[in-house]
C-alpha cells in the first residue's frame, strides 16, 4: 500500500512523472507476471468484487455499504471481505465488535456495522471462514487487481474529478492498472461524486452500465459552529467539498496520508489548531474510528451513497449474482 498524499503530478504530468516511468514499466511487468502465474480459486459463493483502477478514494466503501443494505433488504445472506489496510493483521479474521482499526483496519470496523466482515491480507485464507459462515453472496472490497480468485460480478468505481489521473501506472501516476481492460470487463461502473449530466469521454462507450452516484451526508451536524477539518483518506478534497456543500463553516484543514494511524501527538496538535481557529474538529468516519473519543470532542460526518439508477443496479445484481 502506498502511504502518501496524492501528488500533483499524478493528476497532471510533469518531469517527476516522466522520471518515474521506468519504475512504472517494472510495475506493469510484475503485474503481468503475477497474473500469468496465478491459479484463481473458486470461493464457496457468488462473488461481487468492488474495486477501482487507481490509488486513492473513489467511494468503494460507500458502494459496499449500499450493496450490504440492498442485500439485507432482500434477505440475502452475505459476507464482506476487506483488505485490512493500515492494520497489523497477521491472518484472516472475522471481525467482532471489540476489534479496533489497528487490528483489522478502519474500513473493517465501519463495515462490520452492516453485516459479517472478514479482514484479510491474503484472499486464500478466507475460505475456511467462509465455509463456517455459509453466505449466499461474498462482497469483496478492493481486490479488483487480485488474480487469485474468480469474480462473478465486478463493479469499478471512478471518481468524477480525478478520473484516471495522468494516465500513468504507479508510481509515475495513480493507476493500479490501465482502465480500458477493467472497464470492458466490469458489469457496472460507478461514476462517484458526479453532479453533471455530461459523461467524461473515456466513459461514453460504457453508458449502458454506468451509474452516477453522489456521496451525501447521512447525519445532522450543527451548522452554527466553526469547524477545523482533518482526514487521512484517499480523497480528502472530496471530503472537504462535502463539508462545504453541506453548509459548514470550515476555518482550516489538515491532510494526513491515506489510512493514517494517528499518534497522541497528532491529536494534541489537532486540538491546538482547532483552538487557534476557535473551531470544533470534524473528520470522516474512517478517521473517527481510530480515536477513543469518549467525550465527543471530534465531530464525525457520516456519508452514504445516492445513485441515479437503482433499478439498473438491482436488475444487474440480482440477475447475475
Curated annotation (Swiss-Prot):
The keyword Nucleotide-binding belongs to this UniProt entry's keyword annotation: yes
Binding sites annotated in the UniProt record for ATP: 54-61
The entry's keywords: ATP-binding, Kinase, Lipid A biosynthesis, Lipid biosynthesis, Lipid metabolism, Nucleotide-binding, Transferase
Any one Gene Ontology cellular component term annotated for this protein: plasma membrane
Pathway entry: Glycolipid biosynthesis; lipid IV(A) biosynthesis; lipid IV(A) from (3R)-3-hydroxytetradecanoyl-[acyl-carrier-protein] and UDP-N-acetyl-alpha-D-glucosamine: step 6/6
Domain of life: Bacteria
Catalytic activity as recorded in UniProt: a lipid A disaccharide + ATP = a lipid IVA + ADP + H(+)
GO MF annotation terms: ATP binding; tetraacyldisaccharide 4'-kinase activity
Family annotation (SUPFAM superfamilies): P-loop containing nucleoside triphosphate hydrolases
EC number: 2.7.1.130
One biological process term in Gene Ontology: lipid A biosynthetic process
UniProt record similarity statement: Belongs to the LpxK family.
Name this protein carries in UniProt: Tetraacyldisaccharide 4'-kinase
Native source species: Rickettsia conorii (strain ATCC VR-613 / Malish 7)
Gene name linked to the record: lpxK
Amino acid at each position: 500500500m502506498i502511504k502518501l498524499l496524492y501528488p500533483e503530478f499524478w493528476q497532471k504530468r510533469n518531469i517527476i512523472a516522466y522520471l518515474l516511468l521506468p519504475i512504472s514499466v517494472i510495475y506493469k511487468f510484475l503485474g503481468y507476471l503475477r497474473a500469468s502465474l496465478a491459479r484463481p480459486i473458486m470461493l464457496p459463493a457468488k462473488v461481487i468484487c468492488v474495486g477501482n483502477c487507481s490509488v486513492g478514494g473513489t467511494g468503494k466503501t460507500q458502494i459496499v455499504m449500499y450493496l450490504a443494505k440492498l442485500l439485507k433488504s432482500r434477505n440475502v445472506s452475505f459476507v464482506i471481505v476487506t483488505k485490512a489496510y493500515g492494520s497489523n493483521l497477521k491472518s484472516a479474521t472475522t471481525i467482532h465488535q471489540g476489534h479496533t482499526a489497528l487490528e483489522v483496519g478502519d474500513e473493517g470496523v465501519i463495515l462490520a456495522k452492516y453485516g459479517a466482515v472478514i479482514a484479510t491480507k491474503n484472499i486464500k485464507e478466507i475460505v475456511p471462514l467462509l465455509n463456517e459462515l455459509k453466505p449466499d453472496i461474498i462482497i469483496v472490497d478492493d481486490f479488483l487487481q487480485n488474480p487469485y480468485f474468480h469474480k462473478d460480478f465486478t463493479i469499478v468505481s471512478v471518481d468524477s474529478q480525478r478520473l484516471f489521473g495522468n494516465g500513468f501506472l504507479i508510481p509515475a501516476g495513480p493507476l493500479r492498472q490501465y482502465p480500458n481492460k477493467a472497464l470492458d470487463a466490469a458489469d457496472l461502473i460507478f461514476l462517484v461524486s458526479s453532479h453533471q449530466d455530461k459523461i467524461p469521454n473515456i466513459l461514453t462507450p460504457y453508458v449502458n452500465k454506468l451509474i452516477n452516484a453522489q456521496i451525501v451526508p447521512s447525519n445532522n451536524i450543527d451548522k452554527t459552529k466553526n469547524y477545523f477539518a482533518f482526514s487521512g483518506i484517499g480523497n480528502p478534497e472530496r471530503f472537504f467539498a462535502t463539508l462545504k456543500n453541506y453548509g459548514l463553516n470550515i476555518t482550516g484543514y489538515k491532510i494526513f496520508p491515506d489510512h493514517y494511524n494517528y499518534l497522541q501527538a497528532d491529536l494534541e496538535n489537532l486540538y491546538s489548531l482547532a483552538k487557534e481557529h476557535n473551531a470544533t474538529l470534524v473528520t470522516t468516519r474512517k478517521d473517527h474510528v481510530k480515536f477513543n473519543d469518549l467525550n465527543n470532542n471530534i465531530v464525525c460526518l457520516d456519508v452514504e451513497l445516492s445513485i441515479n439508477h437503482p433499478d439498473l443496479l438491482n436488475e444487474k445484481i440480482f440477475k447475475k449474482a
